């Protein structure tokens, strides 16, 4: 068998993106980041929490400076759009 072909096994801290808690585990990877852990996952806690992230539309509106007031367009009603028929000229 060849010597020194196996990766180094070490203890690293797994960090949770939601709550920030760190858990030590043994692995060959240098660092691990996870979205949720047993400390903040709804299955283990019984409490539902929300992580607010901006979606693509929010990022677009922020980039181009569009506010909530500018998003609402007021269209004229149908009564305003109807014009009286033009009189026929003889």
UniProtKB/Swiss-Prot annotation:
Protein name as it appears in the record: Large ribosomal subunit protein bL31
Gene transcribed to yield this protein: rpmE
Source organism of this protein record: Aster yellows witches'-broom phytoplasma (strain AYWB)
Span list, region Disordered: 71-90
NCBIfam families for the chain: L31, PRK00019.1
Taxonomy, superkingdom: Bacteria
The keyword Transcription appears for this protein: no
Signal peptide: none
Keywords: Ribonucleoprotein, Ribosomal protein, RNA-binding, rRNA-binding
Biased composition (Basic and acidic residues): 81-90
């Amino acid at each position: 068998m060849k010597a020194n072909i196996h990766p180094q096994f070490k203890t690293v801290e797994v960090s949770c993106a939601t709550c920030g808690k760190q858990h030590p585990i043994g692995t060959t990877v240098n660092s691990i980041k996870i979205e949720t852990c047993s400390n903040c996952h709804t299955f283990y806690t019984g409490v539902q929490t929300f992580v607010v992230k901006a979606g693509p539309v929010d990022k677009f509106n922020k980039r181009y400076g569009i506010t909530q007031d500018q998003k609402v367009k007021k269209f004229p009603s149908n009564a305003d759009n109807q014009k009286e028929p033009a009189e026929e000229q003889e």
